[in-house]
Each structure stands twice: as structure tokens, then as C-alpha cells.
């Protein structure tokens, strides 16, 4: 147990047992293999997410005593693993795996109404902003509008204006967001 505290060891063992016993739902992603469903507990998912709470309170799931498998088609398997791991964590920080999938988890946190995950992903996205991901982050911040994330992305774009003009990512962004160029221009050249 060299580097792990007793509390950490207990917590890890507790989660292992919890995930393996009395499972009442299995989750799959759009690209999950048939036998790769992730075991979970409705109560834990419901405690973290209002969407899951409403889903599991519906007659379809409430009346069923069999082990249900739910496909979350908007997520890839690796993202779903990080998503479920977060629901079983203390919610104080993102795991390294979650940090790798911060954009996808940010969207999932919005979709499944998990405010703490949404906030942590926003912080990670802002901390990792650079010219290669600024347009994608800006796009992500638009629906629903997230002012903090949008401002951070605009600032990154503004500071990288010379590289921006020839980027193919800009062309794709313009097609998907017709008002985007105007907003970017205003950010780069503010009126005095």
C-alpha cells in the first residue's frame, strides 16, 4: 500500500465491490461491443443526474425487475467509461481519463444534467485551450451558451489571429456557424 492512503484503499475497494454487486442496469455506448456493457446502479446514476432519475422513475424502468441495458448513442465507449467512473467518484476532480475526453464529457454533462461534471470539464477545457482546439471549444460553448468558456475560446482565437486566417478549421466553423466570423472579427478588432 506504499503510496495509497487507507482511505483511498478503502474507497477503491468499496467501489470495486459496489460495481460488481447488485447491479440493476447496464450501459452501452454507440461503439460498444455486445459483451462490453458497463454495469451500474440506477440509484447512483440517479443521485448524480436528474435525467437518469426521471428515466428510472418512469413506468418503463420502475416496473421492470430484469437487468436493463441502455444504449447512450451519443457517447463512445471510452467516454462512457469515464462518465460512469465520475458518477461513482466523489466528484472533486476529473480523472486522467476524463481529462482526455473533456469535450465529450462536457456535452454529456449538459445532456444528463450533471452540474459538477460540467463545471470540472469547463475548467479543464479552459486550462487546455490552444489554437488547435479553440474553434471546437467555441462551438461547444454555444448551445447552451456558456459565457466563461466562450470568452476563453475567443481570447485564444484573438491571441492567435495570424494563424487563424488560413486555417481549414475556420472554413468548417464558418459553414456550421454563419455568425461565427462576425463574432470572431469583433473579438479580434473591438470597437473603441
Swiss-Prot record:
Disulfide bonds: none
GO biological process: protein ubiquitination
Domain notes: The BTB/POZ domain mediates the interaction with some component of ubiquitin ligase complexes.
Top-level taxonomic group: Eukaryota
Entries under InterPro entries matching the protein: At1g01640-like (IPR044784), BTB/POZ_dom (IPR000210), SKP1/BTB/POZ_sf (IPR011333)
Domain (BTB) ranges: 23-96
Pathway: Protein modification; protein ubiquitination
Keyword Nucleotide-binding: no
Pfam families referenced in this protein's UniProt entry, alphabetically: BTB
SMART domains with a match to the protein in the record: BTB
UniProt-listed CDD domains: BTB_POZ_ZBTB_KLHL-like (cd18186)
Protein keywords: Ubl conjugation pathway
Protein name, entry field: Putative BTB/POZ domain-containing protein At4g04090
